């Protein structure tokens, strides 16, 4: 099963000609999950090899404009490109409290009717995720008879696990964890479940299992009885299960809240972490709830992440290929700062339209 990550926007604060606003797509067997949707994400999608109509889930890390102002426009474009009638499952949208009302009000005010259903699941933050003066309560928002009620889940922190369970299906488990930022922010851990090992052809022959339907049953975990009365169990003929992959994507932060993030990101195959400013501006980064390469690398080291990708760069840091003379030194320095913490383990600097494959574990 193929799996890859495409960066649509790798810049902080606003989109620019060299870096789009925050947006990352995790693609698995053609299905696409979008993480953050900054302004201009839909045009970035059009420039990429991805199809907006393949998006089935959207995860918003926090409610700063450079991470979700592109969402209403993207939903409208998907609707316009879908024709008049669409038979599809609802697009599942996950994000902090307030996201449901934002989308609903945007559609109401613009008289927009989407041709597909969508459901918004809201994560309830805790008071320690941001400075106390920045914590907002949404109970004051005016409600009308037509306000969205009962649409999607309201997801509370599992205090024991220190995380939020968002998805748990046949293939994946997705959980969110708390980050510290100027407003409540979240990170997401996507874990592929173990898959049954391949059939051992030699053992099948040795045990006299005839090719055909019996192979399929054994592969699916069902025992079969041969004509001679012998029962063959799946564990008799299956190789070891294939360990699933783990991708972790963090929103804006100057640190994690609690131990949920460390536990969920432990030994991640791919860890995507913001690095808005270089280490010389660490105090400024912390003041604004952001990270530097050293901070990101320290978290990756704590989690024993196999690969660290830095993103969400200040627009002053131009991609190497687009930098003018002298500008490339700044972005290269970010890599050096992170690699110094990770003892020269390779660090990747994300660029718009960069694609990173996550190979199946052997």
Swiss-Prot record:
Pfam families: Lactamase_B. It is found in: Cytoplasm, Cytosol; Nucleus. It comes from the Eukaryota. Binds 2 Zn(2+) ions. CDD domains: RNaseZ_ZiPD-like_MBL-fold. One of its GO terms (biological process) is tRNA 3'-end processing. PANTHER family: ZINC PHOSPHODIESTERASE ELAC PROTEIN 1. Its EC number is 3.1.26.11. The active site is at residue 66. Zn(2+) 1 binds at residues 62, 64, 181, 252. Homodimer. GO terms for molecular function: 3'-tRNA processing endoribonuclease activity; metal ion binding; tRNA-specific ribonuclease activity. Belongs to the RNase Z family. Its cofactor is Zn(2+). It catalyses: Endonucleolytic cleavage of RNA, removing extra 3' nucleotides from tRNA precursor, generating 3' termini of tRNAs. A 3'-hydroxy group is left at the tRNA terminus and a 5'-phosphoryl group is left at the trailer molecule. The gene is Elac1. GO terms for cellular component: cytosol; nucleoplasm; nucleus. Zinc phosphodiesterase, which displays some tRNA 3'-processing endonuclease activity. Specifically involved in tRNA repair: acts downstream of the ribosome-associated quality control (RQC) pathway by removing a 2',3'-cyclic phosphate from tRNAs following cleavage by ANKZF1. tRNAs are then processed by TRNT1. This is Zinc phosphodiesterase ELAC protein 1. Keywords: Cytoplasm, Endonuclease, Hydrolase, Metal-binding, Nuclease, Nucleus, tRNA processing, Zinc. Zn(2+) 2 binds at residues 66-67, 252, 312. InterPro entries: Metallo-B-lactamas, RibonucZ/Hydroxyglut_hydro, RNase_Z/BN.
């Amino acid at each position: 099963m193929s799996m890859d990550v495409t960066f649509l926007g790798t810049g902080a604060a606003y989109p620019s000609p060299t870096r789009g606003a925050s947006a990352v797509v995790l693609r698995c067997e053609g299905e696409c999950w979008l993480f953050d949707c900054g302004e201009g994400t839909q045009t970035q999608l059009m420039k990429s090899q991805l199809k907006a109509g393949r998006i089935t889930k959207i995860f918003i890390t926090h409610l700063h404009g450079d991470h979700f102002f592109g969402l209403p426009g993207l939903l409208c474009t998907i609707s316009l490109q879908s024709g008049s009638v669409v038979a599809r499952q609802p697009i599942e949208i996950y994000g902090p409290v307030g996201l449901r009302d934002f989308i609903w009000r945007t559609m109401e005010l613009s008289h927009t009717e989407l041709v597909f259903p969508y459901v918004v699941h809201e994560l309830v933050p805790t008071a320690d995720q941001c400075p106390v003066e920045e914590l907002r309560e949404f109970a004051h928002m005016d409600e009308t008879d037509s306000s969205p009620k009962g649409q999607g889940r309201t997801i509370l922190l599992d205090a024991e696990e220190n995380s939020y369970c968002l998805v748990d299906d046949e293939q994946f488990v997705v959980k969110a964890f708390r980050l510290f930022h100027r407003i409540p922010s979240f990170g997401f851990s996507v874990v592929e479940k173990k898959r049954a090992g391949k059939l051992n052809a030699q053992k099948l022959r040795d045990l006299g299992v005839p090719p055909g339907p019996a192979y399929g049953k054994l592969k699916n975990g069902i025992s079969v009885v041969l004509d001679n009365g012998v029962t063959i169990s799946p564990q008799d003929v299956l190789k070891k299960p294939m360990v699933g992959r783990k991708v972790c994507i963090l929103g804006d932060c100057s640190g994690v809240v609690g131990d949920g993030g460390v536990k969920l990101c432990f030994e991640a195959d791919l860890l995507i972490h913001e690095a808005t400013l270089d280490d010389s501006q660490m105090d400024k980064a912390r003041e604004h709830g952001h990270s530097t390469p050293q901070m990101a690398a320290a978290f990756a080291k704590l989690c024993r992440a196999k690969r660290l990708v830095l993103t969400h760069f200040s627009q002053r840091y131009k991609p190497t290929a687009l930098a003018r003379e002298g500008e490339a030194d700044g972005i290269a320095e970010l890599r050096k700062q992170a690699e110094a913490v990770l003892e020269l383990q390779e660090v990747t600097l994300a660029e718009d339209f960069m694609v990173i494959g996550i190979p199946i574990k052997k």
